[in-house]
Every structure is written in structure tokens, then in C-alpha cells.
Amino acid sequence: MSLLKKMSVILSGELTPFLSIGQDASIDEQIEAYMEPVTNSIMDVIFVTVPVGFGYDVPFVLIWLLVGAIFFTFYFNFISIRGFKHAIDVVKGKFDNPNNKEAGEVSHFQALTAALSGTVGVGNIAGVAIAVSIGGPGATFWMIVAGLLGMSAKFIECTLGTKYRIQHPDGSVSGGPSYYLSRGLAKKGKTMGQLGKVLAVMFAIACIGGSLGGGNMVQINQATKQLISVTGGTESLFFGQAWIFGAIMAAVVGMIIIGGIKSIARVTDKVVPFMVGIYVISALVVLTGNLSAIPSALNQIISGAFDSGAMYGGIIGVMIQGFKRAAFSN
């Protein structure tokens, strides 16, 4: 069979799901029908659950991350709390040497804004709402606990990323999990070094899937729904044609990220403070408008924190915020 025929067979196979939907289906419906079984299959693998007692099942990946976070929290003597002031001082540039060029491509503040740009968003709002709806107000307590534990895991990730990164002659930097997995484990012997390379490749592949799925699709999906809602609902230009808005956003984001981390940082250090400001102000407005309900809410959070339903709801909320709503912060 010639190469052209092989490509024709492959292409026809890929288009079959679209053709079977019908001519009346919109592009959005065709894409959703084509992608849904794929995403469901991936989720079945990634979020495989294990029983934890009391009739509850929890994704294994969540248990693994929590175990690691708890270990690092105790190993580093609660660094997430103890080092909070130091972290602020670093971001403010207290330890910068004005006489020497710091290693790295961006400033401490730009690194922070780049990280926050992928953290503050859908997960922070939807994750909390879902946790409370499932486990009650007490679920909020467990989400705070999980957040503090996650900070310790983030600390070790960033530390290893800095320790094992590579700075090239042109000043650019390469680093991250793929580097500290391969280079770090190599110091533990040949066998561990080979394992590190395998894990590095696996992470890189998984990272692509995560960035396309949780990192992009979830965000643009929710943004599109809000846009359609405020521009007329079923009468909106984008109703049934959400791909148009998606294409526009893809082009805008593409122009930013194609310049690498420096280009991203230049945008985030201007946009993120404004974005976070709106986020915090909006939260304060809601709290101010419901001042009389705050004492009761705090009481319900504390009293319901150790209810089994609240604990489970908190775990699910953390899972949705950190994984299904995009694993940004950790």
C-alpha cells in the first residue's frame, strides 16, 4: 500500500466519528462528540480510584500527592508557615544583589506572576463551590489544610527545579521536573539515573496533555460560556460557534507564549496584579455585603470540619481544584 493510500485510510478513520454525527450537528457538537470518549478514557486511567474506607473511593494520584505533601511538611518543619515572611522578602527583592546579574531569565516578581497567572482562575471558584456543595461548610477547612500541605510540595518542586536547572551560554535557562528527575536521580546511581530519564520523558508527555486539557480547554470552555451568557445567550454570535472565540484566544495566547518565558513574564507582571486585585476586591465586596453572616459561617466551618461528609467533600474539592480544574498551583 502506498504512503498516500495509508494516509487516506488513517484520515478516513479519524473523520468517521464526525461523519457519523450527522450533517445537522454544529462544529462544536462534532468536536465534543469526537473528544468526549477520548477524554473519558484518559480520565479513567489518570483518576483511577482506591477504596479508603467508609464506602468512599479516592483517586490514587490524589492520595500519592497528599502523602508526599504531608511528608515534606513535617520533614521541613512546616516550611509553608515558617518561611512565609522569607518568601515575601524574596519576591520584594530584599536579597537581590544590584551589582551582579541574577541567574535566570526573569525577576522574582515576574516568576511569581507567571505562576499566579495559572493558579487564580476557574479552580479557585468552582473547586470551592463544589467542595461546599458536596461536603458542606466544613469542607472549606480541609481545603485550607490541603493548601498548606501543598505549599510544602511546591517548595520542594521549586527548590529542585532551581538546583538542577541548566543555564546556557546565551543566558537562557532550562529546568523543571524533567531535569531534576533525570539529573537528580542520576546522582543515586546508574539504575536510578535510567529510571529518572524514563520518568522525565513520561512527565514531559503528561505535561503536554495537562497543558492542553486542564491548562487550556477547561479555562477557555468556562470563558466561552460566560461570554455567550453576557452577549445574548442563544442569540449570541458565539452560540453554537464557540470555536471562533477559541481560535481568537489561541491566536492571542500564541503570540505571547511564542516568545518564551521572557515574553510570558512581561505580560503577566502587568496583567496578573490587576487580575488578582479584581479577584480579591470581588471577594471582599461579597464578604462586606454579608458581614452579619460571617460569624455563623465560621462557626459552621469549624463545627462541620470533622464531619465525615465534610472531609470527603473537601477531598473532592481539592481534587477538582487541583486536577480536574487544572493542576496549576501544584
Task: Describe the role of every protein-language-model region.
Residues 3-122, 132-139, 150:
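N-terminal alpha-helical transmembrane segments of multi-pass membrane transport
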Residues 5, 67, 72-88, 199, ...:
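Membrane-interface loop-to-helix entry segments
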Residues 45-60, 228-243, 268:
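Interfacial loop-to-helix junctions that mark the boundaries of transmembrane helices
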Residues 72-73, 116-117, 146-173, 182-221, ...:
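Helix-loop-helix module between adjacent transmembrane segments
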Residues 138-145, 265-268:
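Hydrophobic alpha-helical membrane segments of integral membrane proteins
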